[in-house]
Amino acid sequence: DITDLPGGNYNLVIEVRNKKNELIAQKKVFIQRANTGAINSWENIKMINTSGTFTDAYSEEQLNYFLDSIKPVATESDRNLIESLSARVEPYMKKKFLYNFWVERDPNDPYKKWLQYLERVKEVNKSFGTPSRAGYKTDRGRVYLQYGQPYDIVSSVNEPGAYPYEIWYYTTLPDRQTNIGFAFYEPSMVSNDYILMHSNARGELHDERWKVKLYENVASPSEMLDFDNTEVEDKIGGYRAIDMYEF
C-alpha cells in the first residue's frame, strides 16, 4: 500500500533470491509518483505552493481558528496533522495545509468550497454556540458540519420528567447510510450546549439505554437497575418527541 508515500521519483527493485539469500535475478524500474491523496506528512505539505491563493491574506490567528474549525469535516489523519500544526509551526505551513485541504475537496474552485464551509461555520456558531464554546466545537455543531442539515429536528424543552433534548433525523447521510438519528440532551438545563447521547450512525456514540438516561429523574428503580432495559414507561401519557423516530 503506497497511499501515504510522498510524491517524487523512485526505483522499484524486484529481486529473486534462493534459500541461501543469494541474488539470482534483479529488475529495476523507474517510477514517478504524484501523490494526490491526503496530505498527511510534513514532506508533502512543504511541496504545496500557496503563492497567490486565498490563504495569502490570513494572519496566524485566523489560520489557527480556521484549522480548528475544519476538524468536523477532516479525516482522522488530517485531524492528527492539524493537532501537530501548533503555535511553534510557521504560518506558511498552516497556509499550505489549509489550501490543500480545500483543493482536495474541489480542485476547480477550492476558494468557493472554503467560503461555503465558512458560512456553515458561522451558522452553527450562531445557532449552537455558548458563552464559553464556539458552535463548531459543540456536538450539534460538529454533527451539522459533518453530515449537513437534518431532514427533521424534533425539540423538547419542557417535557415532564425529561431533560431538554433534541432528535435529529436524516433520511440519508453523505456516505449513503439511511434512516439515521441523533439524540442530544442538556442535563445541566441552563445552557445551549446539548450533548450527543446516542446515534445509529456508524462511528458515532451508540447507547442502547439513552432513553433511560434521558428520563432518569422519573424512571423506576427496576427500569434503572435492569441493564438490559432500554425503555422508560410513559407515566403521563402525553406527547414524547422520542416516539417520533426509532433509531
Predicted regions and their residues:
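A short tyrosine-centered beta-strand micro-motif
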Residues: D1, G8-V16
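Short, exposed coil/turn segments at beta-strand boundaries within extracellular/luminal domains
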Residues: K20-A25
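Residue-level signal for short segments within beta-strands and strand-turn junctions
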Residues: V16-N18, E186
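Residues within mature, well-folded domains
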Residues: T3-G7, Q26-A38, I45-F247
